[in-house]
């Protein structure tokens, strides 16, 4: 493999060796970006790490319909999602999260304002007193190494670690092949068999089963737009 590809592989190995779960936090307010969630899920899939999507701020009425729709879509394509209220129901939220994070090293990611810090403080109350600064390469292409903080919960009432990524906002996925993308997007891949051409990229080709599924309402239009944004940069055709 090329040097760049080798570097990506090493980053993937490093991440997989240290992290057991990727936790993606979002909330109805401030306005969340579904593409951030989807990019994080794709990155976790590519790294071979299980992912848990955490919908926070469930107590908010504003934007609740959009957040609930996002949860339904994620669940419909097989993703693991839980809904919590770190501020409204802190004890219940903590118990539910500990149940999922027990015994694991969990990476916490999310857009600014989604309540990630509140969740971190619920999980590791002594977080500010016991931090270890380090850099973690999120195996997502160029310029993705970010400062991260590792918090051990062994002194509390549960065993595990939480890795926070303050200020981390973007996942670069330019290194992914079309096969990588399709493997991580089963809702798109399910319709590939209907394509007229074996090397269809599901972009502008005639007789595309994926585009037909979008037109028939069988594939979410926003998901297809997300797929297109990645596929135009993909470096290989499907096998």
Region locations from a protein language model:
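Alpha-helix C-terminal capping/helix-to-coil transition sites in glycosyltransferase folds
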Residues: 4, 18, 102-103
């Amino acid at each position: 493999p090329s040097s760049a590809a080798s570097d990506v592989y090493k980053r993937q190995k490093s991440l997989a060796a240290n992290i057991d779960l990727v936790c993606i936090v979002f909330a109805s307010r401030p306005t969340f970006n579904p593409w951030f969630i989807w990019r994080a899920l794709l990155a976790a899939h590519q790294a071979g790490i299980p992912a848990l999507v955490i919908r926070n701020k469930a107590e908010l009425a504003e934007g609740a319909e959009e957040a609930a729709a996002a949860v339904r879509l994620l669940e419909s394509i097989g993703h693991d999602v839980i809904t919590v209220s770190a501020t409204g129901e802190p004890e219940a939220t903590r118990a539910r999260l500990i149940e999922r994070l027990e015994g694991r090293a969990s990476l916490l990611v999310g857009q600014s304002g989604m309540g990630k810090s509140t969740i971190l403080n619920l999980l590791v109350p002594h977080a500010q007193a016991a931090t270890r600064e380090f850099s973690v390469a999120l195996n997502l292409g160029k310029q993705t190494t970010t400062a991260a903080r590792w918090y051990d919960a062994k002194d509390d009432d549960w065993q595990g670690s939480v890795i926070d990524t303050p200020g981390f906002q973007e996942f670069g996925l330019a290194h992914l092949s079309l096969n990588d993308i399709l493997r991580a997007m089963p809702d798109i891949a399910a319709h590939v068999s209907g394509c007229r051409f074996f090397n269809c990229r599901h972009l502008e080709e005639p007789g595309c089963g994926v585009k037909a599924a979008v037109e028939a309402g069988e594939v979410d239009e926003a998901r297809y737009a997300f797929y297109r944004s990645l596929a135009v940069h993909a470096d290989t055709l499907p096998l």
